A protein has these predicted regions:
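Phosphate/pyrophosphate-binding loop motifs in nucleotide- or prenyl diphosphate-using proteins
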Residues: 1-203
Length: 203
């Protein structure tokens, strides 16, 4: 059955069986990655995305499911050891995979000289949505890490993932022959400087 009614009072189960409130930071963390996966699906299903990028996003979605499983594991539960052995893990190979993809895309792009304003191409804009949702998911992951153990590999993977969507957004603009919109154009602030742009992008 799709519905169990066990969550009707605002609680749900972690892997291990512990019941927690649905506003628990762990649910907020893995729920945001689930949201991110849905946005990745929208991007991957969009017309004009090339086969290689679709393959990369398929792998990313699988990695996100692994990540969600890790976050849903109750590390404080006494039965966790038996559960833990059956939960897949992200590895350094997954981080390296993203780094290689980032480097390959970045090699095709002009050096970044200013802060970019999203917009101008639907694929690029959808990649920016993925990037910003990923950053929100990362903030939840950091908050979760203040109360529970979070594997450093997960942190690195998520940090690289937002960078991947950033360079992908730029690649889509290049492929569409659309000029990137620099921050400050048409605004009283003036052109965004390179140091400021780099600083804001790295937040």
């Amino acid at each position: 059955m799709i519905y169990t009614k066990t969550g009707d009072k605002g609680t749900t189960s972690l892997i291990g069986g512990t019941r927690v409130s649905k506003d628990d930071i762990r649910l907020d963390a893995y729920g945001t990655f689930d949201e991110l996966s849905a946005f990745v699906a929208v991007l991957g299903d969009s017309e004009g995305v090339e086969a290689h990028e679709i393959e990369v996003m398929d792998r990313i979605q699988n990695c996100l499911l692994v990540l969600e499983s890790c976050l849903a594991l109750d590390s404080q539960q006494s039965t966790v050891n038996s559960q833990q052995s059956r939960v897949p893990r992200l590895t350094e190979d997954d981080v390296k995979f993203l780094e290689d993809e980032i480097d390959a895309i970045n090699a095709q792009l002009e050096p970044l000289k200013y802060l970019i304003v999203p917009g101008g191409n639907i694929l690029s804009s959808r990649a920016h949505v993925c990037r910003t949702v990923c950053r929100r998911a990362e903030r939840n992951l950091v908050r979760m890490g203040g109360e529970y153990d979070v594997d450093d590999v997960l942190r690195r993977f998520v940090n690289r993932l937002s960078d991947y969507f950033f360079v992908l957004s730029r690649l889509f603009m290049k492929q569409a022959c659309v000029a990137e919109k620099p921050w400050g154009s048409g605004c009283s602030t003036g052109q965004g400087s390179t140091p400021l742009g780099d600083r804001l992008r790295s937040l």
